[in-house]
């Protein structure tokens, strides 16, 4: 079973914010396969589905971003999913909007949601897709920036990014070599 985790913050006020791009991708994936992310266990919303003939666990932690591991680890344990079959989707301040960076492993890179996952999983050896959201300009604080909604112009770009990310996720679910997926999808959309 493959496991796809989108990171974000819970609550209506955080919907469509930069920090919730991981949730936005999972939501679009759920919508495109006519699924419902409506089961809850261990502080996480989840769905189990067959996507292109493969069994998939889709997760959105119902913790705040900085505690994501508290939801993901128990669900992975419960459904007996290994970190080899895990793919995490999340925002990245250090890349401009419209850029994807896929990695097989690595540090948290300053991202507290990933830090929580590494802490709870006990490893940084899991695949991830970092989705560029850009950095704030002027005197806007990072925390305020990531919790802002995308502008209409940014949403045009992010809509394309979400669709491209879903293609990469589908390739992962289909069992394509991750190196090939990285070669195909790393870069600007």
Curated annotation (Swiss-Prot):
The active site is at 19 (proton acceptor). SUPFAM superfamilies: Peptidyl-tRNA hydrolase-like. Its EC number is 3.1.1.29. Monomer. Hydrolyzes ribosome-free peptidyl-tRNAs (with 1 or more amino acids incorporated), which drop off the ribosome during protein synthesis, or as a result of ribosome stalling. Catalyzes the release of premature peptidyl moieties from peptidyl-tRNA molecules trapped in stalled 50S ribosomal subunits, and thus maintains levels of free tRNAs and 50S ribosomes. GO terms for cellular component: cytoplasm. Belongs to the PTH family. One of its GO terms (molecular function) is tRNA binding. This is Peptidyl-tRNA hydrolase. It catalyses: an N-acyl-L-alpha-aminoacyl-tRNA + H2O = an N-acyl-L-amino acid + a tRNA + H(+). It comes from Macrococcus caseolyticus (strain JCSC5402). It comes from the Bacteria. Pfam families: Pept_tRNA_hydro. One of its GO terms (biological process) is rescue of stalled ribosome. The record marks 91 as: Stabilizes the basic form of H active site to accept a proton. It is found in: Cytoplasm.
């Amino acid at each position: 079973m493959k496991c796809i985790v989108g990171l974000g913050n819970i609550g209506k006020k955080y919907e469509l914010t930069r920090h919730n791009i991981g949730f936005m991708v999972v939501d679009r994936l759920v919508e495109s396969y006519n699924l419902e992310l409506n089961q809850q266990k261990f502080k996480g919303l989840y769905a189990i589905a067959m996507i292109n003939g493969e069994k998939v666990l889709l997760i959105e932690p119902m913790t705040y971003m900085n505690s994501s591991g508290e939801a993901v680890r128990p669900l992975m344990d419960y459904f007996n999913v290994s970190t080899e079959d895990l793919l995490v989707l999340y925002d990245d301040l250090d890349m401009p909007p419209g850029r994807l960076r896929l990695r097989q492993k690595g540090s948290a890179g300053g991202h507290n949601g990933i830090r929580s996952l590494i802490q709870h999983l006990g490893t940084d050896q899991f695949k991830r897709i970092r989705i560029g959201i850009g950095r704030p300009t002027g005197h806007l604080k990072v925390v305020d920036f990531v919790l802002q909604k995308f502008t209409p112009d940014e949403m045009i770009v992010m809509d394309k990014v979400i669709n491209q990310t879903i293609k990469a996720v589908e390739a992962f679910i289909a069992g394509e070599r991750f190196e090939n997926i990285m070669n195909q999808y790393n870069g600007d959309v």
